[in-house]
Design a protein with these regions (language model features):
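Metal-dependent catalytic cores of enzymes that make or break cyclic nucleotides
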Residues: 1-149
Length: 149
């Protein structure tokens, strides 16, 4: 609500947030739990999941409006994200929000390949990557309104 989104936009954001990784069903699940570094080929496979998710969602009339949010949820403000490498304002607001929430969730959960961070460590990581990986204003709203810091 801090972002002046309509009820429909909020509903679509919630749905896209729940389905943002649906494209992972098209990727070998062992890659997501692999200990150690991924090969270039394995990393390329993982980077396909937003495209796969986009294809799945746009083929279902009810989900077509959110397909683009899923497609761009790994894009970065500096254009170094994937799958398209688009910058800043060209990335949908909803995708930018999903990117931040997804990153925070990953940082604060146990993963086989990386230790989880505390809430304060994750907040510092979000701030450190603000303006490059994440939209700075959205990071500030997330920390203040969602995390209550």
């Amino acid at each position: 609500r801090s972002l002046n989104m309509s009820e429909t936009e909020i509903r679509d954001l919630k749905t896209a947030g729940l389905l943002h990784d649906i494209g992972k069903i098209g990727i070998d699940k062992q890659l997501f739990n692999k200990n150690g570094n991924l090969s270039d080929s394995e990393w390329s496979d993982i980077r396909r999941h937003p495209d796969i998710g986009y294809q799945i969602l746009r083929s279902v009339d009810e989900f077509a409006p959110i397909a683009e949010y899923v497609l761009h949820h790994h894009e970065r403000i500096d254009g170094k994200g994937y799958p398209r490498g688009i910058k800043g304002d060209k990335t949908p607001l909803q995708s930018k929000i999903i990117n931040i929430v997804n990153a925070y969730d990953k940082m604060t959960r146990y993963r086989s390949y990386k230790d989880k961070l505390s809430k304060s460590e994750a907040i510092e990581e979000l701030k450190r990557n603000s303006g490059t990986q994440f939209d700075q204003g959205l990071v500030e709203v997330f920390i203040k309104r969602v995390l209550g810091e």
